[in-house]
């Protein structure tokens, strides 16, 4: 089995173009939750720069209610991610502007999985101080990201996906390397041109939408192949 990179990428982009109205609809509530954090984002970026520069004698303070804003942002992120996956897997009739807003168990499960995978990726890097370790760990656990789709559509988590090496590599390429590389290159260009942080943020949002839809398409191909193999 091969996970067709070109076809999957093009199918994801075509899906976004065809369903842009529904995508905007399911983005309204999540954007409301994310908006407070976006307002203080420039201040948070300034604080992060001060932390990296380690300026002595300079007091560092974060904006009020930052923790609350982060929690609201995380809720909106999980809500939008779930609805994107449901839109791809179950069709337009499965989502609406209020879809999953009150399904706190599902959102908590999705958030917990996000934090678990994030910790598994960041912790080894924090211990070693080597960035490439993060990529190695992410490569090893990237099949677990397919469980985000399982959570979205109400299926049980699967810890053993049994992917072939080629499929594993292609999934890592589409879900990690390509989005990261594109965001990194655009960040360099944005800094060189002096573009606003909100322009960079807009590109990050576009990458998020594409990655979410692309993950669901990868899931469909992998699950369909595994089901055919089990017959």
Regions found by a protein language model. Name each.
Residues 60-92, 122-155, 194-226:
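Selective recognition of hydrophobic, aromatic-rich stretches within alpha-helical transmembrane segments
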Residues 22-90:
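Short, small/hydrophobic-residue-rich motifs at membrane-helix boundaries and re-entrant hairpins
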Residues 34, 49-53, 183-187, 198-199, ...:
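Short alpha-helical linear motifs
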Residues 43-51, 122-129, 185-195:
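Juxtamembrane "helix-exit" motif on the non-cytosolic side of transmembrane helices
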Residues 2-36, 98-121, 139-187, 231:
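Interfacial aromatic "cap" segments that immediately flank transmembrane helices
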